[in-house]
Design a protein with these regions (language model features):
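C-terminal catalytic "cap/lid" subdomain
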Residues: 1-273
Length: 273
């Protein structure tokens, strides 16, 4: 298979924030940012939580009400991009790409997004992708997805950036999909670190999909409220794995290079592993 991109990577909010200090983990962001290069697509959560922390530091209080998430996202997205720009190699451009579910449920919008991402690679730019929470209404989104479900066999929500990254990996035919999280990967028993699943493989796409489904049975819970957890990650990556993309689910304390060189503990998913 021919791949258009070397890597689609994703990092979650939990991995970006220094919880004790209540700020961005600048050491981690700097380390990861310096590894980004053209041919990589970086899907980054964190805008909402960064916006919340920034608002609290400036005002001493939190925002109340149903619009808090969108307000925080609007405040945090600029800070998130500024932080990446600060640490990415200055020889490379950094481009903000905000998406919603329509970009994966409408063929014309999908092609437009794909063209943008391909041009980033050609123009020495690194796209930083996030879901556009600032302008996304939960009620409207649900109505739109319901309407789409009448016309399409599959509908992609993509509110979870694990799904966003997986859909992008399919869209651009990525060689590797790397999902950074706050644990080392998928566990047979999430309470026992010795049960880390190192590989999920198969001789072909069909067998691989069956093995992914089997491992979903062991996945319960999530690392934070509102997250979908390991089970959802495995569900989201099935299509990418079936098309030939190699998936890593790894701890964000490691570098991209360490994970891709198979030198640190993680879960690796792919055909004929």
């Amino acid at each position: 298979m021919t791949f258009d991109f070397e890597l689609v990577g994703k990092i979650g909010s939990m991995a970006l924030i220094d919880r004790k200090a209540g700020i961005i983990d600048y050491t981690r962001v700097a380390r990861l940012s310096r590894e980004l290069r053209p041919g990589y697509i970086w899907v980054s959560s964190g805008a909402t939580e960064i916006g919340r922390l920034d608002y609290m530091q400036r005002t001493g209080r939190e925002i109340a009400g149903e619009h808090a998430k969108t307000d925080y996202a609007a405040q945090g997205q600029g800070i998130l991009m500024q932080t990446y720009r600060q640490f990415v190699d200055p020889a490379y451009s950094v481009r903000q790409v905000l998406v919603e579910h329509q970009h994966f449920n409408d063929d014309q919008k999908s092609e437009h997004l794909k063209g943008l991402l391909l041009r980033c690679r050609e123009q020495n730019a690194i796209p930083i992708v996030n879901y556009n929470d600032a302008v996304s209404s939960e009620e409207n989104r649900r109505m739109e997805l319901l309407a789409l479900s009448h016309d399409r066999k599959r509908v992609f929500e993509c509110v979870d950036n694990d799904e966003t990254a997986s859909r992008i990996a399919c869209l651009v035919r990525a060689r590797t999909l790397l999902i950074f999280t706050s644990v080392d990967g998928i566990y047979l028993n999430p309470d026992d670190e010795t049960t880390l699943v190192q590989t999920i493989g198969g001789k072909d796409a069909y067998e691989l999909t069956e093995n992914i489904e089997e491992h979903k049975k062991y996945c319960i819970g999530a690392s934070r409220a509102g997250a979908n957890g390991a089970r959802a990650k495995l569900e989201f990556v099935k299509d990418a794995a079936a098309q030939g993309t190699t998936i890593y689910i790894a701890n964000a304390k490691y570098s991209i290079a360490e994970v891709l060189s198979d030198s640190v503990p993680c879960t690796k998913i792919g055909v004929e592993l």
